[in-house]
Amino acid sequence: MSLNKKLALIIIDGLGIGKKDDTNAVYLANPKTLNYLIKNYPTLEISAAQQPIGLLENQAGNSEIGHLTIGAGRIILNDNANINSYTKRLDYESLVLNDINNEIVHVVGMYSNGLVHSNYEHIHWIIKELVKNNNQVVLHLISDGRDDYPYGFAQFIEQINALKTQYNVIIKSLSGRYFAMDRDQRWERTQKAFNTMFIKQDKICEQSLLEVAQSIANHYESDEFVEPIVFNNDEKYNLKPYQKVILTNYRSDRMRQLAHLLKPNRKFNYHNPFLIKDIHLITLVPFPDVDAITLFEKQNLNNTLGDVLNDHHIKQARVAETEKYGHISFFFDGGINKHYASKTQYLIPSQKVATYDLCPQMSASLITKTIIDHYFDHDVFIVNYANPDMVGHSGNMKQTIQAILSVDSEIQKLYDFFKKNNGVLMITGDHGNAETMIDANGQIITSHSINDVWFIITDNNIVFDQTQKFSLANIAPTILEYLNIKKPIEMAASSMIKKIHK
């Protein structure tokens, strides 16, 4: 099937709708192209957080659930909610954990209530289950500072110390997520975290966990950047062959590199010089390309937007830079690596900088160039521009403004090119971030927001339904109606289109 009009779904990561004041980098940037499109084309404000996309009240959206929901065309049970449906049951017992007896078990996870990559309550649950069978838990903590308050880790120390006392947990190490959860193949970061966690170190931290947490603000920009440190250097708590390691983060994209260092997989070519063989790796949910035992199964999503386009032989292109590549492929396709005959994926390398506020333009221009260069090769483009989110996470207002302006400039190029060639853009965000940079107390915010996002279509023949509130789940049905394709029954959400003028 060949389309009369080329269509591009442009997902501007972290671009939400906020207050028109100096806490909002989007407002301060005053992006002329986006402003023009919002004013001159059909536009809706749609939900990208909380219950409308299957999250909890006051829970911010994130890139994983955002792309998952956009691609699925329905509200889905996210990993956190799915896991909670088991762990909150008093009668639930894990067969995997019940089979672990009288062992030293390493537990690794981000202790955070950001609920983007992890939930600290899952760490509690796993520890409680393990100690029932006389296991010794060795805990490796990862601090957040990105999906939570910049220095929010200190608030958890009392809880963590209670775990230590009540369950005789060994607090072995602490690492900022910058190191332990890199996803851009900066292997020196992941290796540093691995070595600190599992390999004997010459230097041990003399401070208590509380003292370290209280001093983070004096040494680091946020909890995210805490250098990996060891609290216990006892040889018997270093990782050894045949021992078990449980990764408690449920989101895979920022755990796969650490998983690779524990148990090499075909995804990466990097070799761990300190590889410990025959490790038994356990994850909460299945991770792509990772050989691990899983505690919980993922929800199986069929008939996603990618499936339907492929079934109709519509040539689709996925374009993003490294930081968000997994989102427009793995997550967009329902949390599965699907290889469609009709799909071409373009991976644009992210800039090799320590943090993206040092390069707010990121690789946006190469994304645009790739789309334009391959315009006539495909029918539908699924695109992610990462700048507002990745730079917004730095908390640097000035550079976040530059990030937004960089993307705005690229949108102008795409708009001009698509208009000239009778193509159409659909523009949205996957969640908010850059529009809420400072809180009511004047503190920097580096985390996502619960704000709405725009949905714009550059076709004035479209009339949107203004009588109800829509969400990210309505995007796929809208695309299918625009393409005159019947949506599958699994897509429970409706189209946002009221009428198409011929």
Swiss-Prot record:
One of its GO terms (biological process) is glucose catabolic process. Pathway: Carbohydrate degradation; glycolysis; pyruvate from D-glyceraldehyde 3-phosphate: step 3/5. It catalyses: (2R)-2-phosphoglycerate = (2R)-3-phosphoglycerate. Substrate binds at residues 117, 146-147, 177, 183, 251-254, 324. GO terms for molecular function: manganese ion binding; phosphoglycerate mutase activity. The active site is at residue 63. One of its GO terms (cellular component) is cytosol. Mn(2+) 2 binds at residues 13, 63, 430-431. Its EC number is 5.4.2.12. Mn(2+) 1 binds at residues 389, 393, 448. Binds 2 manganese ions per subunit. Its cofactor is Mn(2+). Keywords: Glycolysis, Isomerase, Manganese, Metal-binding. It holds the Pfam family iPGM_N. The keyword Isomerase applies. Belongs to the BPG-independent phosphoglycerate mutase family. Monomer. Catalyzes the interconversion of 2-phosphoglycerate and 3-phosphoglycerate. This is 2,3-bisphosphoglycerate-independent phosphoglycerate mutase.
